[in-house]
């Protein structure tokens, strides 16, 4: 049996842009994404702390430092300046669960890394 477990999280990151006309996804600063063990194309859940919206999308790696841009239709679910939590999950069996520790990245209001 497998269970869906928290794999990684970027906690309280700030939305820097929302691009309705892009083809979907969330663009995440590449350094921040790698620190959180997120891969391009990986499914993530976004939780907007400001308005309570929750939605799923996939990761695109961004080049700009601190960039967090929600793209496509999901851009209607956030506003620039909103604080969100980016969550990734993984399927794990009992042995993997016992050995796993989620990767949690904390950032400040400018999306600068505070701690991992």
From Swiss-Prot:
In Swiss-Prot or TrEMBL terms, this protein is called Aspartate 1-decarboxylase
Its primary localisation, in coarse terms, equals cytoplasm
EC category name: lyase
Question: What InterPro entries does the annotation carry?
Answer: Asp_de-COase-like_dom_sf, Asp_decarbox
- What detail does the entry give on cofactor binding? Binds 1 pyruvoyl group covalently per subunit.
Q: Catalyses which reaction?
A: L-aspartate + H(+) = beta-alanine + CO2
Q: Which HAMAP family match?
A: PanD (MF_00446)
PTM details? Is synthesized initially as an inactive proenzyme, which is activated by self-cleavage at a specific serine bond to produce a beta-subunit with a hydroxyl group at its C-terminus and an alpha-subunit with a pyruvoyl group at its N-terminus.
Q: Which NCBIfam families match?
A: panD
What is one cellular component GO term in this UniProt entry? Answer: cytosol
Per its UniProt record, what Gene3D superfamilies does this chain match?
2.40.40.20
* Residues noted as binding substrate in the record, renumbered to the chain: 57, 72-74
């Amino acid at each position: 049996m497998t269970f869906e477990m928290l794999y990684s999280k970027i906690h309280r990151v700030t939305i820097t842009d929302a691009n309705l006309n892009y083809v979907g996804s969330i663009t995440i600063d590449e350094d921040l994404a790698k620190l959180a063990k997120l891969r391009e194309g990986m499914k993530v859940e976004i939780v907007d702390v400001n308005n309570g919206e929750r939605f799923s999308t996939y990761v695109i790696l961004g080049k700009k430092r601190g960039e967090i841009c929600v793209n496509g239709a999901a851009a209607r679910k956030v506003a620039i300046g909103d604080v969100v939590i980016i969550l990734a999950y993984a399927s794990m069996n009992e042995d993997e669960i016992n050995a796993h520790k989620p990767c949690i990245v904390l950032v400040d209001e400018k999306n600068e890394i505070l701690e991992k």
